[in-house]
């Protein structure tokens, strides 16, 4: 569910921002502002839809009524994720990968630390760790990453002025890249989401209880699949780092480079 939302408002904009900034570094501020406005608008709509339809999503899509609270909490992570994804794309386009790397480190640290703090504060004696605590951790991690990204990029906008005409022109160029990229990400995420929904359902048809089916699915998705897909992560990282160089060479007409 989260991957589909990220495909709609984050991944496509991050890649488009990286490409456009690499091609036109002189217009980088306008490109980023345009990306954030468009991405944040979609993210806000998704947040409203997810929160208001959390019960339907839990019952009809996830087939687990206990996920209602989780879906509502998770909806608040979409907007900050969209904002710092655009900023990450901005720095990738400038070939400054240190900032996105630091952002991810801060996000993971805040996520784990906030989970521990929330459990320590809200747990009643020896009560078990509730799944919603991990969702609160995701929200805290995304918010922390966004705050760090905004503080870091603030210096690049000290003497910047934007015009409606340049913003409109950039929006058309952004849309031309964002739409096909997002469709590609959506198809991939949708396929993955269908798989994630079908695995627990199939396990329940096999005879397992809903709790045990989710337990086994958590083991598969959290332990097994990351190990199997690790080589693909390396290829994805290489693609992210190569995109600005390819875009810059293409804009300069250096096709052989």
Task: Indicate residue ranges for each PLM-predicted region.
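Short membrane-interface helical motifs at transmembrane helix boundaries
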Residues: 45-68
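Transmembrane helical elements of multi-pass membrane transporters/channels
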Residues: 138-141, 145, 149, 153, ...
């Amino acid at each position: 569910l989260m991957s589909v939302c990220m495909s709609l408002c984050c991944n496509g904009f991050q890649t488009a921002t990286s490409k456009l900034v690499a091609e036109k570094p002189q217009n980088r501020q306008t490109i980023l502002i345009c990306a954030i406005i468009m991405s944040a608008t979609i993210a806000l709509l998704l947040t409203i839809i997810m929160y208001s339809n959390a019960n339907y999503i839990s019952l009809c899509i996830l087939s687990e009524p206990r996920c209602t609270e989780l879906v509502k909490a998770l909806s608040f992570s979409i907007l900050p994720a969209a904002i710092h994804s655009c900023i990450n794309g901005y720095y990738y386009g400038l070939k400054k990968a240190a900032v996105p790397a630091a952002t991810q480190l801060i996000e993971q640290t805040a996520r784990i630390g906030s989970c521990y703090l929330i459990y320590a504060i809200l747990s009643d004696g020896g009560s078990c760790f509730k799944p919603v605590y991990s969702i609160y951790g995701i929200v805290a991690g995304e918010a922390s990453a966004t705050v760090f990204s905004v503080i870091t990029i603030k210096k690049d906008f000290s003497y910047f002025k934007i015009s409606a005409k340049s913003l409109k022109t950039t929006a058309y160029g952004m849309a031309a890249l964002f739409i096909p990229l997002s469709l590609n990400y959506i198809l991939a995420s949708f396929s993955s989401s269908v798989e994630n929904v079908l695995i627990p359902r199939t396990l329940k048809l096999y005879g397992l209880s809903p709790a045990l089916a989710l337990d086994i699915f958590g083991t598969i998705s959290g332990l097994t699949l990351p190990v199997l897909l690790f080589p693909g992560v390396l290829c994805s990282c290489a693609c992210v780092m190569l995109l600005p160089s390819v875009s810059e060479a293409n804009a300069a007409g250096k096709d052989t480079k």
